[in-house]
Regions:
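N-terminal catalytic or cofactor-binding beta/alpha core of small enzyme domains
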Residues: 1-90, 101-106
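Active-site microenvironments of hydrolase-like enzyme catalytic domains
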Residues: 12, 80-81, 87-131
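Mid-sequence, gly/pro-rich, charge-dense loop/helix-turn segments that line enzyme active sites
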Residues: 41, 123, 133-135
Length: 176
């Protein structure tokens, strides 16, 4: 039922973008952020939504830019999440899709890619948080971790090499 979506795709860092060149290196002059929906995380979200809808899921794709100023982006996206959950209480899966950014100590940037069906694809990493350190009042972290490991397993079985190791950390982000 399209009127009762169960999945929300959103982007706390909406303007994160990809280098549109097929190279194995990162060019420092490349702008890592874009307000163009065809070049930033909205485009990635559109592809995910299309696949989920083709599989029969009802999905909301929030394309709002929360990182016009980087600081405070998580608070702004959290407000939106709460509004969506109030409007659509049947939501079961909320995915905050980001571009991965790997930087070494010497500031070298790495592009994690895999070859899937003969084409280069950006690898995916799932982040799952938990209580600990300064993170408290996170009662569903075990459920989130189980979901994350199952999603990781399905993706890796379907597309070997696509998934980076799951990142499990004492952080909550907007995972509640």
């Amino acid at each position: 039922d399209k009127t009762k979506p169960t999945i929300l795709i959103y982007h706390t860092h909406t303007t994160e973008s990809y280098q549109m060149l097929d190279t194995d290196w990162f060019t420092k002059s490349y702008q890592t952020r874009s307000n163009l929906a065809t070049r930033n995380m909205v485009r990635v979200g559109d592809e995910i939504v299309a696949q989920l809808e083709a599989a029969g899921f009802a999905v909301i794709h929030d394309t709002k830019i929360y990182d016009a100023t980087y600081n405070g982006a998580y608070y702004r996206s959290e407000d939106a999440i709460e509004a969506y959950q109030k409007k659509y209480p049947q939501l079961q899966v909320l995915l905050d899709i980001h571009r991965d950014a790997i930087q070494t100590n010497d500031t070298t940037r790495i592009k994690p890619v895999a070859t899937i069906n003969g084409k280069k694809a950006a690898q995916i990493m799932i982040i799952s948080g938990c209580e600990g350190g300064g993170v408290t009042d996170f009662p569903d972290w075990r459920y989130n971790l189980r979901f994350a490991t199952q999603l990781q397993k399905i993706c890796e079985e379907s597309y070997p090499g696509l998934m980076r190791p799951l990142y499990f950390c004492n952080r909550q982000y907007n995972m509640h």
